[in-house]
A protein has these predicted regions:
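Short secondary-structure boundary segments
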Residues: 102, 168-169, 244, 409-410, ...
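Hydrophobic anchor at the beta1->P-loop junction of P-loop NTPases
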Residues: 40, 138-140
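Acidic, Mg2+-coordinating active-site environments of NTP-dependent enzymes
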Residues: 73-75, 91-100, 105-123, 128-135, ...
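Switch II (G3) loop of P-loop NTPases
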Residues: 186-194, 350-355
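Conserved RecA-like helicase motor-core motifs
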Residues: 63-64, 162-168
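Conserved motor-coupling elements within RecA-like helicase/translocase cores
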Residues: 181-183
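ATP-dependent carboxylate-amine ligase
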Residues: 5-81, 94, 98, 116-119, ...
Length: 487
């Protein structure tokens, strides 16, 4: 099939060059073109284990350590990475380079040993920047949809035969991993704006899915966050595609030199004729020359349509055959914790989602509402005290469409409690806006599981949402329901 558009991003684009010291933060970014010995402190987390996997695939000798055993360590060990449970200064012996998770403190014995012996130590962002410098990186940034969009794009490029490398914040179901190092020129990476380190990544191409207030505890305010994204756009070597279906994205695209994508007819890439159902979405994507690409996605929600549109546009611009793009998206099975169907027990369907910001929650509720359920029972766990303190009022209308809402206490994510900040803030916000809303505040996890098992009925959808540890609740509730059936 003849491509609908000629690629805007040419096959012969140059590789990104990178100075050894970033102009964004005062951190030396190593050059890792030649094989060396790299030790990873805190290798068990999803982000660092993905990096370790890629480093090993690049030909480096990789070792790593973490405080406790995990499935992630087992996977790395199977890939040939020498992993150790526990931190010990001896683990860094012989290392040419050390990198550490953001959760690893300066008092860590391995970090201290490396620093004292003169072995270079870089952050997660620093080692990720070094990896990006080895390929033409496509950095996917934005407030919402980064992981899903990055996953879709990796699948699209892979199915089109472009053999991309990638590091994603979750495992892609069709690929079975969230990290790979292949022989193609493209490297797809999820760019995290939470601490500003996304500006450290050298990138040939950029994506901003959308822009809303988040991570203000680091940036200080939305104006500062917006300025960081303006830098992200201006410091990207090649084209940047920006979603313009939200106010922040529209303002960014209007001020910066970008390509735009969205439902707006003035967008360079326009989403047309969107149809939604519980089974998924379908739409047409009009390109800059007026040609259209049909897209069907087996994931519900207008937000997923926007994610798919971005992946399709970037895929075509990167040289993927449009027909291969459509075929890849038509079989996209999702990412862990992104509207992930967790099974059916006693006639109740369970879905788990990572949504933790007001607009994400609202979009997930809307997507769930497209099904034919007797009731939509939503369960929400607020994430971080700092985020809850700043955003709790924004949740007042986020749960519209839920028949019953359970709210738990805040998942701290390493933060210390703050006076007056708890899940009750969100409960109060919802009750003030919707006095008739059936909302229940349950602090203790064990009580939540029991209450859900007692409340749920055949024909209900149980939707758990949050970025913390609520993800295991569906399994716990299902176990109780199954025990009840057997009894």
């Amino acid at each position: 099939m003849r491509p609908i558009w000629s690629p805007i991003w040419s096959e012969g684009s140059r590789r990104v060059s990178l100075s050894r010291r970033s102009t964004v933060v005062s951190e030396v970014v190593p050059v890792i073109s030649d094989p060396c010995r790299i030790h990873v402190i805190g290798v068990g987390g999803a982000g660092m284990s993905a990096i370790a996997e890629v480093l090993a695939s690049m030909g480096h000798t990789v070792t790593g350590s973490d405080l406790k055993a995990s499935a992630g360590l087992d996977r790395l060990s199977a890939l040939g990475v020498d992993v150790t449970v526990g931190h010990d200064a001896r683990n860094v012996a012989g290392a040419d380079l050390v990198t550490r998770s953001t959760a690893v403190p300066d008092r860590n014995p391995e970090y201290m040993a490396a620093a004292e012996s003169g072995v270079p130590v870089v952050s997660r962002a620093g080692i990720l920047a070094a990896i990006c410098a080895e390929r033409d990186a496509i950095a996917v940034a934005g407030t919402h949809g980064k992981t899903t969009t990055t996953s879709m794009l990796a699948l699209v490029l892979r199915e089109a035969g472009l053999k991309p490398s990638f590091i994603i914040g979750g495992d892609v179901n069709e690929i079975g991993t969230g990290a790979a190092w292949d022989t193609g020129r493209l490297f797809v990476v999820e760019a995290d704006e939470s601490d500003g380190s996304f500006l450290l990544l050298p990138r040939r191409y950029g994506v901003v899915t959308n822009l809303e207030p988040d991570h203000l505890e680091h940036h200080g305010g939305f104006g500062e966050l917006r300025n960081a994204f303006l830098r992200f756009v201006s410091e990207t070597d090649g084209p940047v595609l920006v979603g313009v279906d939200d106010e922040g994205g529209r303002a960014l695209a209007a001020e910066a030199d970008t390509l735009s994508i969205g439902a707006d007819p003035c967008s360079d890439w326009q989403i047309q004729n969107l149809e939604e159902s519980w089974e998924g979405v379908r739409f047409s994507l009009r390109g800059p020359d007026g040609g259209t690409l049909p897209v069907e996605l087996p994931q519900p929600g207008a937000h997923n349509a926007r994610n798919a549109a971005v992946a399709a546009a970037v895929g075509v611009m990167a040289g993927a055959d449009p027909e291969a793009v459509s075929q890849a998206l038509a079989r996209f099975g999702g990412v862990a914790r992104r509207f992930e169907q967790r099974g059916r027990t006693a006639g109740v369907v369970f879905v788990d989602d990572y949504a933790h910001l007001p607009t994400e929650v609202a979009a997930t509720i809307r997507a769930a509402g497209s099904g034919t359920w007797n009731r939509l029972v939503a369960v929400f766990q607020p994430h971080r005290y700092s985020r809850t303190q700043k955003l709790w009022r924004g949740f007042s209308g986020a749960f519209d469409g839920a028949d019953i809402l359970y709210v738990t206490d805040v998942y701290p994510a390493g933060e210390r409690p703050r006076t007056g900040v708890s899940g009750r803030l969100i409960v109060d916000a919802v009750r003030d806006a919707h006095p008739d809303q059936d909302i229940r505040y349950v602090v203790r996890r064990e009580e939540l599981v029991v209450q859900l098992a007692d409340e749920l009925e055949a024909g209900d959808l149980c939707l758990t949402m949050g970025a913390g540890d609520l993800t295991s609740v569906p399994d716990e509730v299902r176990a109780l329901l199954e025990a009840g059936d057997r009894g």
